[in-house]
Amino acid sequence: MDQAAFTLADLDALTAFDTPTICNALELLAPETRGHGYTTQPMVCGFPQMKPVIGYARTACIRSAQPGTLSASAQNDLRNDYYRSIDTGPKPSLVVIQDLDADPGTGAFWGEVQSAIHVGLGARGLLTNGSVRDLDQWAPGFQFLAGRISASHAYARPVSVGGEVEVFGLHVRTGDLLHADRHGAVIVPPALVRALPDAAREIASRESSILKVARGPGCTAENLIEAFRHLDAIH
């Protein structure tokens, strides 16, 4: 299923569910996705109470620990290529930046200016193993999942644009569809976009029958076993 097979409204419908629920729904619809395709490492979430975000990945790599070796003109050309890549392709987007330094996050590529620029270019959020800063001036509504918070930008600059990157254990290519919230991010197969809301509601229904017993008076192992037995008989 290509992007023409679903609408922006279909994508936005997925933001009604947190990322763990989307992961569960993916397992229901496509069991082969279980165990991979999501972030697996610790991160800092900028806005834990913000609703989930979804968008098409724009990828790049940065460095910040040492000065670059490109001429000023060549570095400016690479910067321009980077911004063009953010502005090219389907939107909304999520920006996925891999910091290649041995100590990722030595300098922050991201702050007040970059967050504002990327909102202007149609991005809804950021995943980076690098660092961010300027938290009080950060663009409203732009989520981030980052490796750390930093004070300085040091020598932060893009060193490559596009292709495959790895952030928090997740391999991402430009154009991948990502769902993210304070728990992390998961790649969403486009063919499953329209089916995911119903699958998510089915998962919630299954869990509610167990939670009703667990949270009710007189919960016992036998009551729980019977509830699980009922689910097994249905599903």
Report each predicted region and the residues it spans:
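Intrinsically disordered, low-complexity regions enriched in acidic/Ser/Thr/Pro/Gln residues
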Residues: 1-76, 80-89, 206-219, 225-226
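A short secondary-structure junction signal
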Residues: 72, 107-110, 129-130, 137-140, ...
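General beta-strand structural signal in soluble alpha/beta enzymes
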Residues: 36-38, 96-98, 126-130, 144-146, ...
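Extracellular/luminal Protease-associated
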Residues: 84-128
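Short coil/turn connectors at secondary-structure junctions
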Residues: 54-55, 90-93, 121-124, 139-142, ...
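Ligand/cofactor pocket segment of small-molecule handling proteins
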Residues: 115-136, 141-150
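Acidic, glycine-rich flexible loop/linker segments
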Residues: 147-223
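Buried hydrophobic positions in well-ordered alpha/beta secondary-structure cores of metabolic enzymes
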Residues: 26, 118, 176-178
